[in-house]
């Protein structure tokens, strides 16, 4: 597997720490300020060069920039304009080393939690979700069939360009994978639905981000899901994380303290021949950190990456 980590596009101490931990590749959130143009070759190249100069190879873009993706998911009057920007971005990404776009299809509200201060081991903070505490604007609404239609429309437009340039689309499950969040329908909520999604436009360039904690929240068998999608060579990217609880009430955990057998999960990836990027995700906020960005603070990443490296070495699964 390729050891990667998630970074904002501006240099930070996390870049240096990642290098010190042996991280080789970057999962990049592209700038979303008004000065950055995702269709401008010089702008995209400049972001790539920042990482290359730091010794991190850009490999995954995550997420699809919200400036375009929100319109695509809603299917509003700026959808075609937004898809055109994605089509222009794809060859620019390919020219600068990016091979994968990790994208979700949650309309209006992205990944959602009801707390960022759930107490985990030793008082560390993790994110949590309790449906009883969810507070979604009732004016936000989209139905299931519209989402399926919009996803198909998007994939039919972009997959041919992805095939041309060797870029892959890795669909991320909905988080949490509820059938509805408020009045917002969700579709990437089960193994069956995710299989349906990647079958909409059959292509070697359309697959999934195996965010394994989402499959756990679905109530799916995580190991069977890895085997199922792995047999098809449809796992393009792995989010290595875990939870404790049920679909309607769960919290994130330390990577060694959840409900999934993480050794067995890694063995499933290994046995499936997965050789793509993996990153730890949604790490605990540790003592002394300010929790400004729950799930993405610094010290917990050090622990999670070290844990992942140790497990991989123990089962003879090379990380590079």
Give names to the regions the model predicted:
Residues 135-150, 176-186, 251-252:
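Surface-exposed cleft-lining segments at the edges of enzyme active sites
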Residues 23-29, 60-63, 103, 130, ...:
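Non-cysteine beta-strand/loop elements that form the S-adenosyl-L-methionine
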Residues 66, 106, 174, 211, ...:
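Short loop/turn motifs enriched for small/polar and acidic residues
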Residues 30-152, 156, 164:
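Structural motif corresponding to the early beta-alpha repeats
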Residues 26, 34-35, 67-68, 109-110, ...:
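Short secondary-structure capping/turn micro-motifs that flank functional sites
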Residues 12-14, 18-35:
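N-terminal ordered "arm"
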Residues 25-28, 66-70, 136-139, 174-175, ...:
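A short alpha-helix capping/helix-coil boundary motif
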Residues 2-4, 9, 15-19, 52-53, ...:
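Histidine-acidic metal/acid-base catalytic patches
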């Amino acid at each position: 597997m390729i050891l990667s980590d998630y970074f904002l596009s501006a240099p930070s101490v996390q870049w240096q720490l990642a290098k010190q931990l042996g991280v080789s590749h970057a999962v990049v959130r592209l700038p979303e300020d008004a000065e950055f143009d995702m269709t401008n070759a010089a702008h995209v190249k400049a972001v790539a060069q920042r990482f290359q100069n730091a010794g991190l190879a850009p490999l995954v873009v995550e997420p699809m920039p919200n400036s375009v993706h929100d319109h695509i998911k809603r299917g509003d009057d700026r959808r075609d304009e937004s898809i055109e920007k994605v089509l222009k971005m794809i060859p620019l990404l390919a020219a600068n080393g990016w091979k994968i776009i990790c994208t979700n299809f949650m309309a209006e509200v992205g990944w959602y939690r009801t707390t960022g201060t759930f107490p985990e081991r030793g008082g560390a903070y993790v994110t949590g979700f309790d449906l009883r505490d969810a507070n979604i604007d009732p004016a936000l609404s989209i139905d299931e069939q519209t989402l399926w239609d919009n996803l198909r429309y998007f994939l039919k437009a972009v997959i041919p360009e992805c095939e041309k340039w060797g870029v892959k689309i890795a669909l991320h499950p909905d988080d949490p994978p509820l059938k509805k969040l408020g009045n917002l329908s969700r579709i990437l909520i089960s193994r069956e639905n995710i299989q349906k999604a990647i079958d909409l436009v059959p292509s070697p360039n359309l697959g999934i981000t195996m965010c394994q904690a989402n499959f756990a929240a679905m109530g799916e068998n995580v190991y069977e899901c890895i085997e199922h999608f792995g047999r098809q060579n449809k796992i393009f990217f792995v989010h290595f994380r875990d939870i404790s609880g049920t679909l309607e009430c769960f919290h994130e955990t330390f990577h060694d303290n959840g409900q999934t057998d993480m050794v067995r999960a890694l063995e499933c990836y290994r046995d499936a021949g997965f050789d793509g990027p993996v990153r730890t995700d949604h790490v605990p906020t540790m003592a002394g950190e300010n929790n400004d960005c729950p799930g993405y603070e610094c010290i917990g990443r050090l622990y999670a990456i070290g844990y992942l490296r140790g497990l991989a070495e123990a089962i003879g699964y090379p990380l590079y």
